[in-house]
A protein has these predicted regions:
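Extended intrinsically disordered or low-complexity regions, especially N/C-terminal cytosolic tails and loops
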Residues: 1-141, 212-213
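Amphipathic alpha-helical surface "interface" segments used
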Residues: 11-17, 186-191, 281
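Short, hydrophobic/amphipathic alpha-helical patches that form generic packing surfaces
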Residues: 41, 45, 142-167, 257-267, ...
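Amphipathic alpha-helical scaffolding segments
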Residues: 124, 165-169, 238
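Flexible secondary-structure boundary motifs
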Residues: 145-212, 220
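Histidine-centered, metal-coordinating catalytic motifs and their short helical/loop contexts
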Residues: 206-235
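Amphipathic, Lys/Arg-enriched alpha-helical patches that create a basic surface
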Residues: 235-281
């Protein structure tokens, strides 16, 4: 419903009432933007309950928290100008509603399949492969590879905007890359793979997107170049750059990487929603 700009709030509330199996749903949702804000509240609730138990000061929390403060405190006129600049790279609203919300709903609908992988988040073990493997099978290789590939594409679309926001936050200008070889126009001309590679020059983004933008998994799924060893629970991917080389990742590590990717998508969605809601209201 949120994909339709002319959607009636009454239709949204009825849909939500049916989804939650209740007679009536929240009143006071009178506009399309109210409904988007409400859906974002549901995302925030899911995020709060599913995020890893890591301190806000950790490398995994710094960027998200700083961007939320940045979006909350910026002068509204300046924020509106920034939004117009960002929309050159991808529509914030379209990404939020059509890409992020849809992907989040899909993963939430089967989140129990990822519960074992979340253990690594609880123990703050973010580096893959993990030395202590769980050897549990709550999701198969085909499904987790497909989920990871889908999440990769969701992040891929919003990546230029996250880069621009980090530039603005850290250095005061969307074109001020940590590696001064780039501007946003130059970054946009890069292939997706080269954009991901360029992130390695930025310590903040490199750490933030750790595990979320693995080209080997994505290419293995996209080009049907992956194999599964059920005996050892290992996913094997043909290296796109070196076809004679196989990349091995334990199944539960792929699930953990997909879970972290999912967390990142929720965080970016909350930042984008904060920007849009301040401008809309």
């Amino acid at each position: 419903l949120l994909n339709k700009q002319n959607m009636k709030p009454e239709a949204y509330t009825k849909k939500m009432a049916k989804a939650f199996n209740i007679d009536s749903y929240r009143k006071g949702l009178s506009t399309y933007t109210d409904c988007v804000a409400h859906y974002a509240e549901l995302v925030e609730c899911c995020y709060t309950n599913l995020k890893p138990n890591t301190p806000a000061s950790s490398p995994y929390g710094i960027l998200f928290n700083d961007l939320m403060v940045f979006a909350s405190d910026m002068d509204k006129n300046e924020l509106r100008i920034l939004k117009d600049e960002l929309n050159q790279y991808y529509s914030l609203k379209e990404w939020l509603v059509k890409n992020a919300f849809s992907y989040i709903a899909k993963i939430i609908s089967k989140i129990e399949k990822y519960f074992p992988a979340m253990f690594y988040g609880v123990t703050e073990e973010h580096t893959c492969p993990h030395s202590n493997q769980l050897y549990l099978v709550t999701i198969n290789d085909e499904e987790v590879n497909a989920d990871y590939s889908s999440g990769y594409e969701v992040i891929e679309k919003i990546l230029p905007i996250v880069v621009a926001l980090e530039n603005k936050l850290s250095r005061g200008d969307i074109n001020a890359f940590e590696d001064d070889r780039y501007s946003m126009d130059q970054f946009m001309k890069l292939t997706v793979g080269m954009r991901v590679k360029a992130l390695q020059q930025n310590d903040v983004l490199k750490t933030y997107f750790l595990n979320s933008l693995n080209n080997k998994i994505r290419n293995g799924e996209t080009h049907d170049n992956s194999h599964y060893d059920s005996e050892h629970q290992i996913c094997r991917y043909i290296d796109f750059n070196n076809p004679n080389n196989m990349v091995e990742i334990p199944l539960m590590d792929v699930a953990f990487m997909t879970y972290i990717q999912f967390i990142r998508i929720m965080e970016i969605a909350l930042v984008v929603n904060k920007i849009l809601q301040r401008i809309w209201n």
